[in-house]
Amino acid sequence: MAKKVAGQLKLQVKAGSANPSPPIGPALGQRGINIMEFCKAFNAATQEMEKGMPIPVVITYYQDKSFTFAMKQPPVSYWLKKEAKITSGSKTPGKGAKAGTLTKAQIKTIAEAKMKDLNAADIEGAMAMIEGSARAMGLEVVG
């Protein structure tokens, strides 16, 4: 018989650095999930990834206090900042001050990596979404 799902929890955790301190510990603890078990499993699953990369994770927890988790690709903003080699977007996007520039090829690379997490039918649709995010961060898309 299948386990009864008690709920789902969405978190964003840095790769390789899950620990029981806030915000992870309290979020898991109040739902009765074994915090250290999650931290060990998550860190083991992300050990090959770049340390500190933000990873969205969806934790499904069951009434018997067990859990499973699914990891997604890092947010588009992370990829945009990494490709543009900047630490943050423009403070006033669209007002003249550009935070950096990206090429269509860089946008396509990001779109291919994020395709399974995006709500897009094809790569062109995914690229359009990512270009919109880039403009919202004050990045200029050229080429």
Swiss-Prot record:
The keyword NAD does not apply. CDD domains: Ribosomal_L11 (cd00349). One or more lysine residues are methylated. Pfam families: Ribosomal_L11, Ribosomal_L11_N. One of its GO terms (biological process) is translation. GO terms for molecular function: large ribosomal subunit rRNA binding; structural constituent of ribosome. One of its GO terms (cellular component) is cytosolic large ribosomal subunit. PANTHER family: 60S RIBOSOMAL PROTEIN L12, LARGE RIBOSOMAL SUBUNIT PROTEIN UL11M. Part of the ribosomal stalk of the 50S ribosomal subunit. Interacts with L10 and the large rRNA to form the base of the stalk. L10 forms an elongated spine to which L12 dimers bind in a sequential fashion forming a multimeric L10(L12)X complex. Forms part of the ribosomal stalk which helps the ribosome interact with GTP-bound translation factors. Belongs to the universal ribosomal protein uL11 family. This is Large ribosomal subunit protein uL11. It comes from Rhizobium etli (strain ATCC 51251 / DSM 11541 / JCM 21823 / NBRC 15573 / CFN 42). The lineage of its organism: Bacteria, Pseudomonadati, Pseudomonadota, Alphaproteobacteria, Hyphomicrobiales.
